[in-house]
Amino acid sequence: MSHFSTIKTRLREKDILLKALLTLGLPVDVNQELENPVGHDHAKVMCDITLGTDIGFRLNRQTKNYELVTDLQTWKHPTPPQRMIEKITQEYAIELIAREIKKKGFEIETQKRNVDNNVELVATRWV
């Protein structure tokens, strides 16, 4: 029998998470229900952010972190779940850093992704 699983993350800010998902080119929707048609119960779960019909993020009210919600047995995405979380977390960190840099009066001059997938940001500020 198939069922929804949750994978913990340390992603806390919805707006930053949305930007990261959009940057990755993922189909984003908000406040939608995921439905698992496998089995007889047709399990449903409400998510704050959904990526299509089978992957979502739901806020854990206790930890204040968003958790990835999906059915791991019927995973259809070409990227494995753990790798997807790594990519999303990296983009989330870039978006969060960019926001904080701008708050302090800096401008991002360049952003470069190296062959090893590390990201290099160069920020400047006039004094």
What spans do the regions from the language model cover?
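Interaction-mediating elements
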Residues: 1-127
